[in-house]
Every structure is written in C-alpha cells, then in structure tokens.
Amino acid sequence: GTLRRLNEWGVDRAVTLHIATSVHAMHKVNDFAAAVKSERLYSFGSVHPDAPDALEELDRIQALGLDGVKFHPDYQDFFVDDDKMAPIYEKIQSLGLPVTFHAGWDPLSPKVVHAEPERLARVLDAFPRMTVIGAHLGGLCRYDQVEKFLLGRRNLYLDTAMTAPYLEDEAQYVRILRGHGLDRVLFATDCPWSTPLRELPLLERAGFTPEERERITWKNALALLERKR
C-alpha cells in the first residue's frame, strides 16, 4: 500500500499521521502507529481530548518512540483553544513532541471550523515552546486569516497538504510561504486525498530556487523529525 506508492512516486520517506477519533480507540491507534513506524515512515500518535488518561498516553507515545502527536479538532470535536486542552498542551510542550493540527475548514464540519487561524494563534501565544505544525498552510480555505494571524511565528511550521485543490490564488501561496519563512515550511499532501503528483506542480510553479525547493520538500522535515530519533 503506502510503501508501494512511495516507491512509484520516488519518495524516500514520509510521515503518517494517526487520529484518535474516540476515547476507546486511543490506545489501539497508538499501538498501530508504533507498529508501522520504520526507517522510511515517521509516525505520529494521537490522544483524545476527553480521555481521562490523555496525559499518561502522551508519556506512552514518547515511550513508543513515536515522532509526534496529531489532532484533528473537527473529528475529535474540540476547539483548538479550549481551556480543557491546556494540560495536554503543557504536557506535549514538556515532552518536546511536535504536534500537528488539522487547521481550517473541513468537509466533515463545514459550518463550524474548530481550528481557525486566530484560535491557533492563541495556542501559539500560550505555549511558546511547543512546536506546532499547522496543516493546510495553517488554515484550509482560511488563507487571508493565516496571513493576518500566523505568519512569522517561530514555534509554527506550515505544511502544504491539500493546497493545490483549494488555493486558487497562487500569488498568495508564494506570499504565505515567503512571509512565514521557508525554513518553517513542510511539503505535504494529505494522501490519499491529494498526492505529490497534484501538489508538486504548484510548488514548482512558485518560482523558488532549487535550494529553496529542497528545504521545503525534505530538508526542513528531516531537521525537525530527526531531532526526535
């Protein structure tokens, strides 16, 4: 499955992001995340915000050798800046684990966006030592808000997942990446919903130098993720 497709696309390494969509599934999700982790696959675990043992599970995520934590506020039904998340974020920050958030709009919850860029900015302010990866350029279909609230924050990486199908203004794509700082941009796809074949042409049309494209497509990610291995 995944490794076969990576071979087809000529991709050496990838990141798999797992989501605990319910309390009772949390431990099994992280067991699976640990089972698929390999030299080629970095693997993020997850905790459910309503799990009574969420803090203990974060310790287990680290003990399992997982590479970070993934939240999807729409699937897990919480606002990213909810006060109940503070102990969880404090624990993640103390463990030094990077955390990825689905950010912005999602078709599962089209009328209620749980991770608006302004909400994510509050989290970044409250936990300045927590390394955050804002998926979908920090806010799917919320690109103007990304420019207003998120650009240039040193504890934030922006990934490019699922950008090509939604971002119509390619000049804004370049403006966001350069405005944030190319050392904190990570190429991503959101496979299987999008693929490198769909996302790479957008990056290639953006006018970056070969060295800049290398930083975005793999060097930044390697520097970030190898700190945990």
Question: What are these language model-derived features?
Answer:
Residues D12-R13, T21-P107, K111-H114:
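Active-site gating/metal-coordination segments in enzymes
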Residues D67-G68, D81-L186:
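Catalytic pocket-lining loop regions of alpha/beta-barrel enzymes
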Residues I61, V123, V132-I133, T209, ...:
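A generic "structured core" feature
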Residues T2-L3, N30-A34, L58-D59, M85, ...:
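Generic structural signal for well-ordered alpha-helices
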Residues L17, H72, A188:
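Conserved residues at the C-terminal ends of beta-strands
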